[in-house]
Amino acid sequence: MNDLISSSFKRYTDLNHQVQLDDIESQNVSLDSGNLDEFFGYVESVKEDMKAVDEIHKRLQDANEESKTVHDSKAVKKLRARMDSSVTEVLKRVKMIKTKLVALEKSNAAQRKVAGCGPGSSADRTRTSVVSGLGKKLKDMMDDFQRLRTKMATEYKETVERRYFTVTGQKADEETVEKLISSGESERFLQKAIQEQGRGQVMDTLSEIQERHDTVKEIERSLLELHQVFLDMAALVEAQGNMLNDIESNVSKASSFVMRGTDQLHGAKVLQRNNRKWACIATILAIVVVIVILFPILFNTLLRP
């Protein structure tokens, strides 16, 4: 069993190292900032990787459901190998997605330095919005794997409770179960109890329990690392989203200023027209007053001999 665990962990470590090398090589590949076709091609590549991750998640769910009906240690071992393979594959896929998102972010940053494509431009808003959309999908994926990890841990806890009752005839309290799981002593305790009670015929059951324990712990470690990668990507995409929100906020403020300026200009024109109208009226009134004053004087002057 120890050989199996060591072998599985070594494969996982080797793959993790290879992924890191792949990441370094991928980061050396530049994405043409001005080429939208290449940008959207990269986006489609990320979506394909996401689709593959969804399929692996479905396989892990199916394997977890299958584990509930398997009670033979050899069958559990075979199932564990499948799940190990799926988890290492999903880790590699997700790290590839992370590398591509970094490339997209660098491409967007370079694009903002191009004349006419700076922050707030339609091209920049489109690019930022696309990356932000990928981030929302990544968050959903992260939540899916987090729920799967929680579900597996809960179901394993229930398995330990059932086995404890089978061996001792007593229902384990919360503290006992947590101690058995956290310390890894559940299998040792069950083995001791079985031997003391002379239940040699159920040793295969013990092997099955140990396989389940090893599977859950190994998968949980891998899923925790996967969760951390998701968190790293979420931080990257959140920065893009905040930038988009800032751009949209500034555009909204600019639009508000323009509208306010337009309203003020319209008001000024109306005021100007009103001033002209009143000036004309005042002029006419002044002329009328002058005529009214001068007419009698002129009339009397004309009537004098």
UniProtKB/Swiss-Prot annotation:
Keyword vocabulary terms for this entry: Acetylation, Coiled coil, Membrane, Protein transport, Transmembrane, Transmembrane helix, Transport
Cellular component terms (Gene Ontology): membrane
InterPro entries in UniProt: SNARE, Syntaxin, Syntaxin/epimorphin_CS, Syntaxin_N, T_SNARE_dom
Recorded GO MF terms: SNAP receptor activity
Domain t-SNARE coiled-coil homology: 206-268
Tissue specificity: Expressed in tips of root hairs.
Vesicular compartment spans: 300-305
Bilayer-spanning residue ranges: 279-299
Coiled-coil ranges from the UniProt annotation: 46-66
Gene disruption phenotype: Reduced root hair length.
Topology of the protein relative to the lipid bilayer: Single-pass type IV membrane protein
Signal peptide: none
Pfam families on file: SNARE, Syntaxin
Lineage top rank: taxon: Eukaryota
SUPFAM superfamilies in UniProt: t-snare proteins
GO BP term (any one): intracellular protein transport
List of residues that carry N-acetylmethionine: M1
Localization terms from the record: Membrane
Segments in the Cytoplasmic topological domain: 1-278
Family from the record: Belongs to the syntaxin family.
General function of this protein: Vesicle trafficking protein that functions in the secretory pathway. Acts in coordination with SYP132 to mediate tip-focused membrane trafficking for root hair tip growth. Functions in root hair elongation by forming SNARE complexes with VAMP721,VAMP722 or VAMP724.
Subunit structure: Part of the t-SNARE complex.
Name this polypeptide is given: Syntaxin-123
